[in-house]
From Swiss-Prot:
Organism: Cereibacter sphaeroides (strain KD131 / KCTC 12085)
InterPro entries, per database record: PurM-like_C_dom (IPR010918), PurM-like_C_sf (IPR036676), PurM-like_N (IPR016188), PurM-like_N_sf (IPR036921), PurM_cligase (IPR004733)
Protein name listed in UniProt: Phosphoribosylformylglycinamidine cyclo-ligase
EC number, UniProt record: 6.3.3.1
Reaction catalysis annotation: 2-formamido-N(1)-(5-O-phospho-beta-D-ribosyl)acetamidine + ATP = 5-amino-1-(5-phospho-beta-D-ribosyl)imidazole + ADP + phosphate + H(+)
HAMAP family tied to this protein: AIRS
Family matches, as CDD domains: PurM
SUPFAM superfamilies noted in UniProt: PurM C-terminal domain-like (SSF56042), PurM N-terminal domain-like (SSF55326)
Pathway: Purine metabolism; IMP biosynthesis via de novo pathway; 5-amino-1-(5-phospho-D-ribosyl)imidazole from N(2)-formyl-N(1)-(5-phospho-D-ribosyl)glycinamide: step 2/2
GO biological-process terms attached to the record: 'de novo' IMP biosynthetic process; adenine biosynthetic process
GO molecular function: ATP binding; phosphoribosylamine-glycine ligase activity; phosphoribosylformylglycinamidine cyclo-ligase activity
């Protein structure tokens, strides 16, 4: 009797269930380290549970945010430097949550690739866990999708989803008024927006990712992968102190597009560009691309990753509090009557 032919398996189609299970086991300790009051369940269930009462809330309003890392991923993939890209993913979500006045509570990630490499995926998700722990946010679940034929070899994509809460009536922006002071919190470089432009500039420069960064520091690739700053704990400390009327996360659209999102109709902002030094990475990008200053200001954070809008009579106190939390704080302008953002001085 002829030997029975072996049937086709899921692994033959390119999906390795065992690799997925191995990844879950490997990242469980990192996820466990992010546990906080309210965390009920660990990884592995069909859904993840979170107890708002145990987290200390009485009449909470939930706030949700989702985001990705954009084409910064391309640099991480091309250089193999994937350890901090997960921090970027968390920062892009939780920094948005805090702008609504919410405390980040829990986070879920989505990791998709053509062929799951457990070691690579673990490095990425451990970075996500690091960002969550630094934000007081529990990593309570996620999805790993192995999809052969959908991605080139070695490529992957990331998305994140965060949920936070605040007590009813504590949402931001609230009470923004003419004369309010704008406090700028320093960025850590490009953060996670504008990387399609960045990659085009690098192409024009003729430099490789392993070349020394023209603006100083490490290799060009590593310098451009500096992780997005997490502003959660220090921003929440300022909010709880009172006097904070709004927070604006400076992402895609730069200062020009993001600050107006937290200003009520009839109010604009005046920013003094001479108040801070343009970081060298932005100067290099602008000079290499012959980029006009208005374009720079509506593309990048230009060294200011978060703007805190505060009552004028509380500005010094809030600035001191933020500085004590480790922030680089600069008084960059004020809220004025009008619309949009106007600028005094020059960055370039």
């Amino acid at each position: 009797m002829a030997e029975q032919q072996k049937g086709l398996t899921y692994a033959d189609a390119g999906v390795d269930i065992d690799a997925g299970n191995a990844l879950v086991e490997r990242i469980k300790p990192a996820a466990k380290r992010t546990a906080r009051p309210g965390t009920v369940s660990g990884l592995g269930g069909f859904g993840a549970l979170f107890d708002l009462k145990a987290a200390g809330y009485h009449d909470p309003v939930l706030v949700a945010a989702t985001d990705g890392v954009g084409t910064k991923l391309r640099i991480a993939i091309d250089t193999g430097e994937v350890d901090t890209i997960g921090i970027d993913l968390v920062a892009m979500c939780v920094n948005d949550l805090v702008c609504q006045g919410a405390e980040p509570l829990f986070f879920l990630d989505y990791f998709a690739t053509g062929k799951l490499e457990v070691a690579q995926a673990a490095r990425i998700i451990e970075g996500i866990a690091e960002g969550c722990a630094a934000s007081g946010c529990a990593l309570i679940g996620g999805e790993t999708a192995e999809m052969p034929g959908m991605y080139h070899k070695g490529d992957f994509d990331l998305a994140g989803f965060a949920v936070g809460a605040m007590e009813r009536g504590a949402d931001l922006p609230q009470g923004v008024a003419e004369g309010d002071v704008l406090l700028g919190l320093g960025s850590n470089g490009v953060h996670s927006n504008g990387y399609s432009f960045v990659r085009k500039v690098v192409e024009l420069s003729g430099l490789g990712w392993d070349a020394p960064a023209p603006f100083g520091g490490d290799s060009l690739g590593r310098a451009l992968l500096a992780p997005t700053r997490l502003y959660v704990k220090q921003a929440l400390a300022a909010v709880r102190a009172g006097g904070v009327h709004a927070l604006a996360h400076i992402t895609g659209g730069g200062l020009t597009e993001n600050l107006p999102r937290v200003l009520p109709e009839g109010l604009g902002a005046r920013i003094d560009l001479s108040a801070w030094e343009l970081p060298s990475v932005f100067r290099w990008l602008a000079e290499t691309a012959s980029m006009a200053e208005p374009e720079l200001l509506k593309t990048f954070n230009c060294g200011i990753g978060m703007i805190v809008v505060v009552a004028a009579d509380r500005a010094d106190e809030i600035a001191a509090l933020l500085a004590a939390e480790g922030e680089t704080v600069t008084r960059i302008g004020e809220v004025i009557a009008g619309e949009g953002v106007s600028y005094d001085g020059r960055l370039l």
